[in-house]
Structure formats: structure tokens, C-alpha cells
Amino acid sequence: MAQLANIGELLSMLDSSTLGVRDDVTAIFKESLNSERGPMLVNTLVDYYLETNSQPVLHILTTLQEPHDKHLLDKINEYVGKAATRLSILSLLGHVVRLQPSWKHKLSQAPLLPSLLKCLKMDTDVVVLTTGVLVLITMLPMIPQSGKQHLLDFFDIFGRLSSWCLKKPGHVTEVYLVHLHASVYALFHRLYGMYPCNFVSFLRSHYSMKENVETFEEVVKPMMEHVRIHPELVTGSKDHELDPRRWKTLETHDVVIECAKISLDPTEASYEDGYSVSHQLSACFPYRSADVTTSPYVDTQNSYGGSTSTPSSSSRLMLFSPPGQLPQSLSSPSTRLLPEPLQASLWSPSAVCGMTTPPTSPGNVPADLSHPYSKAFGTTAGGKGTPSGTPATSPPPAPPCPQDDCVHGSAAQASATAPRKEERADSSRPYLHRQSNDRGLEDPPGSKGSVTLRNLPDFLGDLASEEDSIEKDKEEAAISKELSEITTAEADPVVPRGGFDSPFYRDSLSGSQRKTHSAASGTQGSSVNPEPLHSSLDKHGPDTPKQAFTPIDPPSGSADVSPAGDRDRQTSLETSILTPSPCKIPPQRGVSFGSGQLPPYDHLFEVALPKTACHFVSKKTEELLKKVKGNPEEDCVPSTSPMEVLDRLIEQGAGAHSKELSRLSLPSKSVDWTHFGGSPPSDELRTLRDQLLLLHNQLLYERFKRQQHALRNRRLLRKVIRAAALEEHNAAMKDQLKLQEKDIQMWKVSLQKEQARYSQLQEQRDTMVTQLHSQIRQLQHDREEFYNQSQELQTKLEDCRNMIAELRVELKKANNKVCHTELLLSQVSQKLSNSESVQQQMEFLNRQLLVLGEVNELYLEQLQSKHPDTTKEVEMMKTAYRKELEKNRSHLLQQNQRLDASQRRVLELESLLAKKDHLLLEQKKYLEDVKSQASGQLLAAESRYEAQRKITRVLELEILDLYGRLEKDGRLRKLEEDRAEAAEAAEERLDCCSDGCTDSLVGHNEEASGHNGETRTSRPGGTRASCGGRVTGGSSSSSSELSTPEKPPSQRFSSRWEPALGEPSSSIPTTVGSLPSSKSFLGMKARELFRNKSESQCDEDSVTMSSSSLSETLKTELGKDSGTENKTSLSLDAPHPSSPNSDNVGQLHIMDYNETHPEHS
């Protein structure tokens, strides 16, 4: 709390009127900021500034260095989010960024930038918006790389504020809308200068929508008319603009100058673009009258620089008159010219301007540049600025400049003419007023004595009225035609949007309106509390035409004729020459803001727009102020413009004309001949006409020289502008160099301090190092001792481990001994029960021993009495008894231990026997499981075998049928010869079947057709064998040669029936006569099939399981088949089931049908 109270006292002392106290407190704060790293002090300063607006606190905050920049930005970001403090904190931010701190590059990464953009997107307070936009414009050149992240936000803000300028809410003061419009133009200028490709793309996409077209036409298009085509639009791209490498080589002022180069506005463009500031240097001259009717800015049709002129320029002319007096054209319309003495030699404006002989022929001058200043000042070449008596040889009136041409006029011409529009006459000369375009329609002819510039055409017209009526009518017709051309272009004014006059629009009021506003301006200037400029601007807003955007001109002080006013004006010009304001409000404008102070964003206009021109203005102003203080009469003459020289020329001509009239020998000089209807003498008229013609020729010559000098000046002005820009750049670089030198000095001082501090720290480090080295050595010594001790302990530990290992071994042995001892104890306990008798005997013996001991004692006493020494003998006997007793005990222990060990061995063997029995049971169970599994697998294999056998049997039957058909077809030609043999064979088969088989024969009749189409008789084709019979073949048929189709049928039949004749007791299968022979492959296969068929029928009744494995069955298949054939050779009368061996069927063998198989014979 004490510290907070101390900070409060110091803050109150900051606003002290004593400069020393203030400096001391500021130094204390800076030292505190350098020493303290926390945010508390910065937050306190920000809060105090927001409460009091203290300038010393502002100075401290704007000079903060790292690391307090983060604290300041965080605090500003916090207050930006609050509506109550948003305006004040944005003003503070503007002051901070305006000074371009060293940590300005951190602004792009700080959270303050998104908060500022959000505020500009959502806030509705026009003052806050204006301040925020100006702050953003100031920050953009410092953080150009932020465009890659926030470029769309910048464009959205521009689109929102441009439409805001068009909507113009009624609750907002119009002056603030004017300021907002100025800030939007500055934002347009900055975005177009930095990101032209992206910005033009945004404008194309955003304003191509129907709802934004009006905003484009009213706001954005006039802005675009005042910028050049950016080179990046041709050579660059969107990605290149956002590339950070583009901005690495550019400083902040480089970015600002690059943006300024693309402007066409003479008051906004950079100095090298032909900007002339002579109108700002006119503070050393007494200002002309501010009558709007004499202003060259008001004519939009004939004004050469009308496209870049603003109503603020005419408004400034209105305010150039002192507040306490009316404009001269209104207050003293009949003031007469003060005649000057006629010089001995012919007076020439070129001599007054200090010009030499003009350059060569103007043959190359374009037609539109022949009379630039006459266009710029609303005069024509035909003599609107000359007497009305100009002969017809004068050049014809130049056509008025169209509005489009004026808008798109050359920047060089605009810069060469527009700045000269406000130049003032010499302080020693009276006020002169250039002629207005519509003066001839409004002002009646004045008296001859009124020789002001405005009354000069009437005066000259009175002089020329004595000419003949034809010439007078011609002149009046020419004047009327010229005036009609001027007034026709101004006849249809368009009321601007919003009903107020902003400085971004052109003014083309009619003459009566200008007079009204001029009078109003003079009336306001004469009041006690004069109203500010914008109040007079607001009054004539409804009468102004549709306006075009133009930038803000730097301010100019109000006119004051008195010397005190001159001093005040010079002082104000010196102090505020670089403080532009949107409306160029003079110091009295503070009344409009209520508090008597400038708006909070006024200081930001200096950095929002290019300031090269402002620096040039300040430099030239200082030079001219010095010249005015030294010799204003002589020094200011060369600075006069050609138009002022032309005014002086007309003044000189009027004076010469009056002197010539005074020299004439007229009867009465006061007689007005034209008034009385007469005519003056011819010689006087001729003299006057000659002199007037001479004067007109001189004016034409001077105009020609002025044009040539203007061309030359424009060429030189470009060089001067570039030189001044380079000087300004050098000055900026020098300032930057000075700042860097200051920084270098500061860093050198800090380096020295740091070096001293480093030396102290080095000494402290050395002492600490020595101490640490000694400590390290001590610790190393201790470590070595501890290491030795640890080694000793390690060896001891190893010994202890070895001892423990030995002890464990001994423990195991001891445990074994204990086990044995326990066994022995158990045995001993058993034996002790058996040794009770031995104990009784021992007790008895002990009793006897006691008795004998007593007897022995008696004997000993007797011996002692007899003195014999028997102690040795007794001791030896005792030791002998003891040893024997110990021996017996040890023997007993051994016996007990052996008994225990044998018992334990018996127990172990019994346990092993039980385990083995258990294993045998498990193996038996496993064998039973294996047997059951094998039997299951065997049954599955047999079932598969049976199924495969049936399938094979069916296939073989089909194959045999096919082979039989083939053989039958081959034997058709010999079938007739074999009928007899076939019939006999059939009878024999029938006889055999009736004797040995109880089954009926199934005959198979075959019908065969011969080659001649005859039908053959059918023969039985097969038999069904008995259940126990099996068809077998003899060994002779198995060993016989292969049957071939070439064999005769008789041989085949004889060989086929040989086994049947040789074995009468065996069952003979019933065959068909058409079957193949027994020696052929088909015959063998047929026999095997019949045998297998009968075997399968018998197997269905007697199927048993075989104990052998499937593999053994398959190996012994052939032998079992032969055995089965021998067993089945039974009589058909007594069939019986086959043996169990008949269940084993041989493996199926598929062979070539053309070969014989001896195993299946």
C-alpha cells in the first residue's frame, strides 16, 4: 500500500507546474520502468492517463521500451473491449504508434490488432471509427506483413465505412462524417498503395453487387479518380504482394512514400510528383478578399484545376478575411485604387517577377495549354480580364473545359496551377479581385472612381461607351455570349447527398449564391463569437451540386491585416503547419466540439496521409517567414505568381489610363460625356484607343512570356520536387541516423555499465570458482576416502557373501543333520520305551554304585588313614567310565539316525510306487482312448471304401457293357458259325446251375442285328450267384496269354470254359455267351465283378470288426483275396457265411483295360 501511495503522489507531481519537479518525477518513473519488469506500473500509468489525459504520462507511455510493450498492448487491448474507454485508449494507441516505437513489429502478433479490427467492424460511434481507422492507417506501413493474415478484414472495414459515409446517419454530426470520409480516403490510399492487386480484386468483387453500386459511384469512384495506375497491377500478383520478402527491404517511411507516389492529388501526392506548395507559403502576404465570387475555384467548367479543388479552398478564401472586418468586396466596394507613379521605363511583369527573356517560340505549345491560367482563374483569352474596349483582333474566347476533362486533367497542370490559386498580393499593394464569371450579370456599372478589380471591367466599359454603336453592340454581344456559356453550365446544380457540404466535393454555386455565402461569411467573421468553418459550410449544402472527392489540404491560418494579426498568423502557421485537419478548421473551430479542444484523432491525420509535402511546406514556410521578417517588400516580390503579376499589370494600366486622362486638355475633366449623350473629342479618343491597344498588346506579349515561363517552370519544378524529395529523404535518414547515434551512445553507456557489471560479476565468478575448486578438491578427497571405504566394504561384503554362502551350505548340512537327528530321535524314543528295563537296571546299578561309593569312601578313609594315594587311580577310572558312556551314547545316536533314514527311504519309495501306479493307469486310459479313436477312424475308412467300391463297380459295369458291345459288333459276321457252340454252352450252364445253385437264373436275351438286317436270337447275359459262392479262376487262365481280337472264337471259348471243366465241385458262375473269353481282359474283369457282387451280398449279413489296423489290412489284401477264393469254393447246396477274413476287401486298383493282372485271375 505504501508503494501504491507513493505512486499516487508521484503521479500527482507529474502535473506540477514546476518543470524541474516534473522532469525529476519523469526520470523516477523511467528508472522504475527500467528496473521493474512487472505490468503494475504500466497499468497504473494507463489508468491515470485515461482519467486525467496527462501529457507527461502520455510522454512516458509513448517512450516505453521492451519488455513493457507487451504490458502496454495488453492493457490497451483490455480497454479496447470496453465501450466507455474505447475512444481514449484508441487515442493513446494513436499517440504510441505515431512515434514508431522500436517494438512496432510486435503489433502484428499482438492480440490488439484483431481487437482493433473487430472494433472497426462492429462499432457505431463515428469518432471511434475515425480514430480507429486513422490508427490502422498509421500501423499498416509498420506491419505490412500482417496483410497476409488480416487483408480480408482490412477490405471488410473499408467496405463498411465507405457505405457508412454514404448512409450518413442523422444522429451523427456532419463534421465527424466529413472526418470519417477523410479517414476512409486515407485508408483507400493506403490499401491501394500497399496491396493494389488484392484491393482492386476486392473492389471488383464487392462493388459488382447491385446493392453496392451506389456506394461505388458516390464514394469509391471519386477516390479512384485521384490515384495513378499502380505498377504492381501490371508486374505484380496477389501472392507477390503478400510475400514477406517484399517488405523486408522497406522501412516504414519507404512504404509511406511508395503509397504517396500513386496519388494524383497535389496536396496529397509526394513531393516528387510535381506538388507545388506556393499557396501555403502565402502566410507572409496580406490575404486578398475572401469573396467567393472572386475565387478561381468555384467554376467547375472553366477552372483548370477544378477537378482537384475543394470547397474547403473557397471556404478558406471566405475565412481569410479578418474576423473583425468584412471582405473588401463587400465592406468597401467603392474603394479607389491607390495610383502608383508611372515608372520612367516601360513597366513589365517579367521584370517584377525577376524573369529573364522568355524561351523560344511557343509553336510546340498544345492548344489546350495556350491559356492555362486564364482557364484556371475563370477568365477567357477574349478579354474578360481585359477592358471591354479590346478590339476585334484579340483572340477569341477559349471554349470551356468539359467536366470530364477537368476531372481527368494532367497532374502536372493541376499541380502547377492549383497551388497558385491562393497566393496573395504584396503587402504594400491594395487588395485586388479577379473578375467573376457571372459578375456582368449581377453588378450594375459603378462609378468611374471605383477601380477595384471587380469594378474595372465596368470602368473600362464606360470609357469605351463613346465608340460607335456597332462596335459597342459587338462587344456586348460577345460578352453576353461568353456569360451565357458560363451560366448555362452552372444552371442545373445537383443537390448533394446528405444535405451538407463536405470538403471532398467541388463547389459550383451560382453568382448570387456565392454572394450570399460571402456575405454570410463576412457577417460571421465580424461577430463576437465567430462560428467555425463547418458551420458556414453546412448552411449552403443544399445549394451545392453533386460533388467529387478530393483530399484534405494542409491548414492555412486566417487572414489578418493588422501587424498583430500577422504575428499571430505566423505563429499559428509555424506551430500548426504540419497538423492537417479535414476541413482546415481555424483555431476558432474548437467551439464546435464543445470542450474547446481538437478532436482526439486530429494528430493522426499527419501520419495517415503522405507527409512529404507537409515537410516541404514547413521548410519553405520557415524560409519565407525569415525573409518576411528581414525585408518583406523586396523578398516577397519574386515569389508572386504570374496571375498576381497580371493583376498588377491591369492595375498599372488603370493608373496609366487615369494619368493620360488627366493630361488631356478636356474642357472639364469632371464632365461625363457619355452621361450627357455627347462624345469626347476625336483626338482624345484616338489617343486613348491607341494607348489601350498598346496596353492590350503588352498584355498579350506578357501572357505569351508567362506561358513560356510556365512551361519552363513546370520542367524546373519537377527537378526541384525531386531534389526536395531527396533532401527530405536525406533529412529523414539523418534524423534516423541521429536517433541511431543516440541509440548507439545509449547502448555504449549501457555497454560500459554492463562491462563494469560484467567485470564485477567476473571477479565474483573467479572468487566463486576458486572457492568451488577448493570445495571440489575437498569433495574429491572425501570421495576418494569414501571410495576406499566403499572398496573395503565391498571386499567385506564379498567375504560376507562367501561366508553366507558357506553358512548356507552348512545350514543345509545342519538341516540334513537335523532331519537325521529327528529320525534318530524318533527311533530313540521308540527304543527308550524298550529300554525301561535297561534303565531299571541302571538305577539298580546306580544304587549299587552309590553303595559302592560309600564303601569306597570308607575304604578311602581307611586308606587315608593308612596314607596310600589312590586319587589318580580313581580319576582314571572315572574318565574311563565317562568315555565308555559317551561311546555308548554316540553309538546309540548313530543307530537311531540310520533307522530314521531307512524309514524315510521307505516312505519315498512308497510314494514313487504310487506315482508309477498312477502313471500306468493314465497310460492305460490313453491307450483305450487311442484304440477307440483308431476303431472310429477304421470304421470311417471302411465306409468310405465301401462307397468308393460301389461307385467303381457301377462304372466298371458300364465300361464292360461298352466293351461287350464293341466285341459283339466285331463278331457279328461270325455269329452264325458259333450258334451251335453257344447253344451247347448254354445247355451245360443250365445243367450246372440246376445242380449247384438254388437261386433262379436270370436270363438276359440279347438281340443283335447282322449286316443283312437279320434279327439274332437272344442269349442269357448273366447270372446271379449264390450267397456263399464266389467266382474264381484257375491258374491256367491267370497265366494264359492275352486275348486279342485276332484269336479265333473257338480258342477263346475253349480257354474260357477250361476252369469250369477242371473244377466240377466248385460253383460255376452263370455267364452269357456273348461275354469275352476268360483269357482276355474283359473276361477277367467280368469274373471279378461277379465275384465281388456275390461277396458284397454275403458281407451284408456278416460284418465284423477287424482288430488289426487299416494299413496291415491293405498290405495283406492280395493274400486274403486268394484265401477267400479257396474258402468260398463250396457247394451251392449248402451255403454258409464266409469266414471273418472274407470281410477284408482288397484295395481297389484301376488298371489299363488292355493289360492282364495276375493277382485278380
Swiss-Prot record:
One of its GO terms (biological process) is nervous system development. The gene is Tsc1. Keywords: Chaperone, Coiled coil, Cytoplasm, Isopeptide bond, Lysosome, Membrane, Phosphoprotein, Tumor suppressor, Ubl conjugation. This is Hamartin. One of its GO terms (cellular component) is lipid droplet. Phosphorylation at Ser-502 does not affect interaction with TSC2. 'Lys-63'-linked ubiquitinated at Lys-30 by PELI1; the ubiquitination promotes TSC1/TSC2 complex stability. Residues 393-402 have a biased composition (Pro residues). There is a cross-link at residue 30 (Glycyl lysine isopeptide (Lys-Gly) (interchain with G-Cter in ubiquitin)). Residues 721-849, 879-917, 967-991 form a coiled coil. Non-catalytic component of the TSC-TBC complex, a multiprotein complex that acts as a negative regulator of the canonical mTORC1 complex, an evolutionarily conserved central nutrient sensor that stimulates anabolic reactions and macromolecule biosynthesis to promote cellular biomass generation and growth. The TSC-TBC complex acts as a GTPase-activating protein (GAP) for the small GTPase RHEB, a direct activator of the protein kinase activity of mTORC1. Residues 509-529, 1064-1077 have a biased composition (Polar residues). The keyword Coiled coil applies. It comes from Mus musculus.
